[in-house]
Each structure stands twice: as structure tokens, then as C-alpha cells.
């Protein structure tokens, strides 16, 4: 019975690898990290009012950032946003 459990575990892990590996190679990942330019704008959980720029899929647009939290799709300037996210 011990060998049957080992074979079952190997089979399970093999199937898990085959199912999840393509997601790691998808277009949303670069160098093992999620492409921040595809994330939605996120004002964060705080109540401050800072002007920031985010990439909306076509260009960089302004949004109001609350000062904490949020995600990586926030840039201090339009130039910084375009440099990181615009495709040549």
C-alpha cells in the first residue's frame, strides 16, 4: 500500500504541474512577476489626495491616490508611466 500512495502523490503533483505551468508563462508575467501595467487603478485605503498616473491599457491617465496601499500601477509622472508601460 505504501507504493500506491507514493505513485498517487507523484501522479497528483504531475497533473498539478501540467495544469499550472502554462499560467506561469502567460503574457501577464515578465521575469516571474505580474505585469503591473495590466493592473487596474487602485486609490488605496487611505484618504489623502495625491495625483498619480496609471496605465489603462492604451495610455497613461491621472487618478487620485489615497497615499497608502494600492498596487504597482501608479506612477508619479506621466513620463514615468509611459516609460514603464507604453509599448513601442
UniProtKB/Swiss-Prot annotation:
Give the main localization category: secreted
Looking at the UniProt record for this protein, which Gene Ontology cellular component terms does it annotate, in alphabetical order?
extracellular space
Any additional notes? Negative results: shows weak voltage-dependent inhibition of voltage-gated potassium channels. At high doses (5 uM), is more active on Kv1.1/KCNA1 (78% inhibition), than on Kv1.2/KCNA2 (10% inhibition), and Kv1.3/KCNA3 (28% inhibition).
- Species for this entry: Cyriopagopus schmidti (Chinese bird spider)
Q: What does this protein do?
A: Serine protease inhibitor that inhibits trypsin (Ki=5.54 uM) at a molar ratio of 1:1.
Sorted alphabetically, which SUPFAM superfamilies does this protein's record hold?
Answer: BPTI-like
Cystine bridges: 37-85, 46-68, 60-81
CDD domains associated with the record? Kunitz_huwentoxin (cd22598)
Propeptide ranges are 28-33
Report the family membership. Belongs to the venom Kunitz-type family. 02 (native) subfamily.
Taxonomic placement:
Eukaryota, Metazoa, Ecdysozoa, Arthropoda, Chelicerata
List the residues marked with site Reactive bond for trypsin: 47-48
Superkingdom is Eukaryota
Kindly list the residues the record flags as site (May bind Kv1.1/KCNA1).
Answer: 39
Name it: Kunitz-type kappaPI-theraphotoxin-Hs1a
Amino acid at each position: 500500500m505504501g507504493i500506491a500512495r507514493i505513485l498517487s502523490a507523484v501522479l497528483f503533483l504531475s497533473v498539478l504541474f501540467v495544469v499550472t505551468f502554462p499560467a506561469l508563462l502567460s503574457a501577464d508575467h515578465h521575469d516571474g512577476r505580474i505585469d503591473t501595467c495590466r493592473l487596474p487603478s487602485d486609490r488605496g485605503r487611505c484618504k489623502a489626495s495625491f495625483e498619480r498616473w496609471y496605465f489603462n491599457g492604451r495610455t497613461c491617465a491621472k487618478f487620485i491616490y489615497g497615499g497608502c496601499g494600492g498596487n504597482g500601477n501608479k506612477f508619479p509622472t506621466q513620463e514615468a508611466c509611459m516609460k514603464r508601460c507604453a509599448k513601442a
